[in-house]
Amino acid sequence: MIDLKALRENPDVGRASQRSRGEDPELVDRLLDADARHRALLTSFEQQRAEQKELSRAVGKAAPQDRPAVLAHAKSRAEQVKSAEADADRARAELDALLSRMPNIVADGVPPGGEDDYVVLRHEGTPRDFAAEGFTPRDHLELGERLRAIDTERGAKVSGARFFYLTGLGARLELALLNAAIDKALTAGFTPVITPTLVKPEIMAGTGFLGAHAEEVYRIEKDDLYLVGTSEVALAGYHANEIVDLSDGPLRYAGWSACYRREAGSHGKDTRGIIRVHQFHKVEMFSYARLEDAAVEHERLLAWEEELLRLVELPYRVIDTAAGDLGSSAARKFDCEAWLPTQERYLELTSTSNCTSFQARRLGTRERLEDGSTRPVATLNGTLATTRWIVTILENHQNPDGSVRVPAGLQPYLGGLTELRAS
């Protein structure tokens, strides 16, 4: 949820943010009008309630002959107060409905535009020249099947399209990746957490995942619970309605969880293999930070992501995501995309978002200041490793015979294996 006070003071910032996202800037004006109506009606209700209390006291002090008239007046005022409260509640509901549609304010410097308007910040590593090496690279699914590591046919048989099994070397490779990610997180001072994958509606809504992209989320209607698409959701809810201590710096958690996504808007995209699937595993970084420290913490999360990409020796690029491609909670997002040889394109492997106070304001997560007051904190998140990395590791490190070289940084997590080769 955005800061209404800040929006009242500088509505042009909100309008500019909406335009950069490709959203309706008039939402800001409708929101401010609803806010003004609510505040006026709330003030009227509170004034009438105070007068009602005075009348109640007056009843007890009234002379016997005056008491019936005073009682009638008090009864009439009670009805007016009840009506005024209902008016204020309706205005609050209208305001809340508009607030739920208003995304976070985009940070300064974020490129405007949509999905294709990102800015490339840098390239790291050089893609292999397979033609110069004298062979045509196989895609990750062919490699995975030859290694008996990926089984999409049985995944589809058991669960439907976009499901799969990781078996043998595939399962070991994923566990190696995720354990390497946890070790990286521990070294960086994160507390590892195995999170719930089912959350309440208020937690899912508080993180911003029930807005425009609600169709991407699995819901268990009988229990009114949602399956998370990232442990970010559970970690954001971890300190909901709490005051956290940030006096020693950010609170950092690394969540390991299964993740579930409906991919409702992805019909026909990445249908081969395990690039875009309904279920996968991920280690997610999550930080609670002071607002003034959030931008620096965002750069730290990005740096830790890049360290892990270098550990597995992938050529990649870093992009500054355009405003129209940000989630509703994010003020800024950096993506790391690794080179995918068989498709000759970059594939997103990590993203890290600075959500400023947007999620914490909705979820009631605050810090106490020196003067005793409280304020919302900033929340940030970033992918450290996920199942999708297997795609790029197999393709970038393949040998002509279909075996796959294990990057040196992963070898300790695979029992010293230097190659993945079908037994």
Swiss-Prot record:
Its Enzyme Commission number? 6.1.1.11
Q: Name one Pfam family in it.
A: tRNA-synt_2b
GO BP terms:
selenocysteine biosynthetic process; seryl-tRNA aminoacylation
Keywords from UniProt, A to Z, are: Aminoacyl-tRNA synthetase, ATP-binding, Cytoplasm, Ligase, Nucleotide-binding, Protein biosynthesis
User: Does the UniProt entry include the keyword Nucleotide-binding?
Assistant: yes
Pathway membership of this protein?
Answer: Aminoacyl-tRNA biosynthesis; selenocysteinyl-tRNA(Sec) biosynthesis; L-seryl-tRNA(Sec) from L-serine and tRNA(Sec): step 1/1
- Residues that hold ATP according to the record: 261-263, 277, 348-351
Biased composition regions of type Basic and acidic residues, renumbered to the chain: 1-12
Q: Name one GO cellular component term.
A: cytoplasm
Q: Which InterPro entries match?
A: aa-tRNA-synt_IIb (IPR002314), aa-tRNA-synth_II (IPR006195), aa-tRNA-synth_II/BPL/LPL (IPR045864), Ser-tRNA-ligase_type_1 (IPR002317), Ser-tRNA-synth_1_N (IPR015866), SerRS_1_N_sf (IPR042103), SerRS_core (IPR033729), tRNA-bd_arm (IPR010978)
Predominant location? cytoplasm
Q: What one GO molecular function would you report for this record?
A: ATP binding
Amino-acid positions noted as binding L-serine in the UniProt annotation, renumbered to this chain:
230-232, 284, 383
The record's region (Disordered) falls at 1-26
Quote the function comment for this protein. Answer: Catalyzes the attachment of serine to tRNA(Ser). Is also able to aminoacylate tRNA(Sec) with serine, to form the misacylated tRNA L-seryl-tRNA(Sec), which will be further converted into selenocysteinyl-tRNA(Sec).
- Fetch the HAMAP family from UniProt: Ser_tRNA_synth_type1
| Family membership | Belongs to the class-II aminoacyl-tRNA synthetase family. Type-1 seryl-tRNA synthetase subfamily.
Subunit architecture: Homodimer. The tRNA molecule binds across the dimer.
Q: What is known of its domains?
A: Consists of two distinct domains, a catalytic core and a N-terminal extension that is involved in tRNA binding.
Query: What name appears for this protein in its UniProt entry?
Result: Serine--tRNA ligase
Q: Which gene encodes it?
A: serS
